[in-house]
């Protein structure tokens, strides 16, 4: 019998082993759809981004006009831009749900997969930040100024580092040029890291909602999960096009319709919605270096989760106390997101400070304690 090309060709067999004949737990739920959705987000962003880059000019005098030109004069330029801008929001929705799934079901115990995933999140955040600067509107300029300025809080080398990053003494033309270069480069780094992420995942195989070894009950990825994934793609792309066509500016800041002006500061400088939780934590500490450290810790704490797992069970499926704590954490993050969008005044300051403290306490103290308590309860 002739050998099956799908199983023997050097390139096709890699695709076959990751997308066709991959043994998959039979009981994974829709929460396992978000990995492939993130892949679709990445492909969509790279394609729309490439088309936008073809019409964009990375120069302070022309950037804003070039984006306006794309929307007015390029065939479907308005659609490409709206898909790209809102695609970023969907990327973050999917990655936050994907991380939440990993946290709930103990997927972080695959340490290499988890750590490459957190690295992917950091790279995505960097990409979104430099991308937001490119249209060179008011919020682009002032957002870039405020966030890059945080590096000056680093002792001794801070100021030198910031001026080196800016390419001058303020955010200006050199900054915009290098941010464009970085925004073009980083998505390909994300694509490379994604392959590493998948390589580590396929070493161990997928986790499942029960958190138990599922080797005795695996089914092929295709057709079962390929079909399930396509349904996910359809739903997400439908939501994305609906947002991009009906209210493309819903999640944007009106300040960005005004060209960047270094002489006029917007009344409320705030990042896009997906950074608001971290921004709220940054603002809740009345010290520059302290705020920067808390901001970094709010995301880097994810690297610690494998070491904070004290439970005898992997997932939270049969751990009601941990479930309660998990949803408290979700609610806490929503409160932080809301506070981050509000002005710095009473009562938002104290709410932000309480929510920031609670965020760290839940992850660092309450989760391990609750796990230990649940272990004790298993004995009775």
From Swiss-Prot:
Top-level taxon in the UniProt lineage: Eukaryota
GO cellular component, one term: respiratory chain complex III
Binding, a ubiquinone: 202
Record's subcellular location: Mitochondrion inner membrane
GO molecular function term, any single one: ubiquinol-cytochrome-c reductase activity
Cofactor(s) of this protein: heme b
Transmembrane stretches, start-end: 34-54, 78-99, 114-134, 179-199, 227-247, 289-309, 321-341, 348-368
Residues where heme b b562 binds: 84, 183
Topological type in the membrane: Multi-pass membrane protein
Principal location: mitochondrion
UniProt-listed GO biological process terms: mitochondrial electron transport, ubiquinol to cytochrome c
Residues given in the record as heme b b566 binding sites: 98, 197
Subunit structure: The cytochrome bc1 complex contains 11 subunits: 3 respiratory subunits (MT-CYB, CYC1 and UQCRFS1), 2 core proteins (UQCRC1 and UQCRC2) and 6 low-molecular weight proteins (UQCRH/QCR6, UQCRB/QCR7, UQCRQ/QCR8, UQCR10/QCR9, UQCR11/QCR10 and a cleavage product of UQCRFS1). This cytochrome bc1 complex then forms a dimer.
Similarity comment: Belongs to the cytochrome b family.
Name recorded for this polypeptide: Cytochrome b
């Amino acid at each position: 019998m002739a050998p099956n090309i799908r199983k023997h060709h050097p390139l096709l067999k890699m695709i076959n082993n990751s997308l066709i004949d991959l043994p998959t737990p039979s009981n994974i739920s829709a929460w396992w759809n978000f990995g492939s959705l993130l892949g679709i987000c990445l492909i969509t962003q790279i394609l729309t981004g490439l088309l936008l880059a073809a019409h964009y000019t990375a120069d302070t005098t022309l950037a804003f006009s070039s984006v306006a030109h794309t929307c007015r004069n390029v065939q479907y330029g308005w659609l490409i831009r709206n898909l790209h801008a809102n695609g970023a929001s969907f990327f973050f929705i999917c990655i936050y749900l994907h991380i939440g799934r990993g946290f709930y079901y103990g997927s972080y115990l695959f340490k290499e997969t988890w750590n490459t995933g957190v690295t992917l999140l950091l790279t995505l955040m960097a990409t979104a930040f430099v991308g937001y600067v490119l249209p060179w509107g008011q919020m682009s300029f002032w957002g870039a100024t405020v966030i890059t300025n945080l590096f000056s809080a680093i002792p001794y080398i801070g100021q030198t580092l910031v001026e080196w990053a800016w390419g001058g003494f303020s955010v200006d033309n050199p900054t915009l040029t290098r941010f464009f270069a970085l925004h073009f480069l980083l998505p390909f780094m994300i694509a490379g890291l994604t392959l590493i992420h998948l390589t580590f995942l396929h070493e161990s195989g997928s986790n499942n909602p029960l958190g138990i070894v599922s080797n005795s009950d695996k089914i092929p990825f295709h057709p079962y999960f390929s079909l399930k994934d396509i349904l996910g793609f359809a739903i997400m792309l439908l939501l994305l096009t609906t947002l991009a066509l009906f209210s493309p500016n819903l999640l944007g800041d009106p300040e960005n319709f005004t060209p960047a002006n270094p002489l006029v500061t917007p009344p409320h400088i705030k990042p896009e919605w997906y950074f608001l939780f971290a921004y709220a934590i940054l603002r809740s500490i009345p010290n520059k270096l302290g705020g920067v450290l808390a901001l970094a810790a709010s995301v880097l704490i994810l690297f610690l989760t494998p070491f904070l797992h004290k439970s005898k069970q992997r997932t939270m499926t049969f751990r009601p106390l941990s479930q309660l704590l998990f949803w408290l954490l979700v609610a806490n993050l929503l409160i932080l997101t809301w506070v981050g969008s509000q002005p710095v005044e009473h009562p938002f300051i104290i709410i932000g400070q309480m929510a920031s403290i609670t965020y760290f306490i839940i992850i660092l103290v309450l989760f391990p304690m609750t796990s230990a308590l649940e272990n004790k309860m298993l004995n009775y």
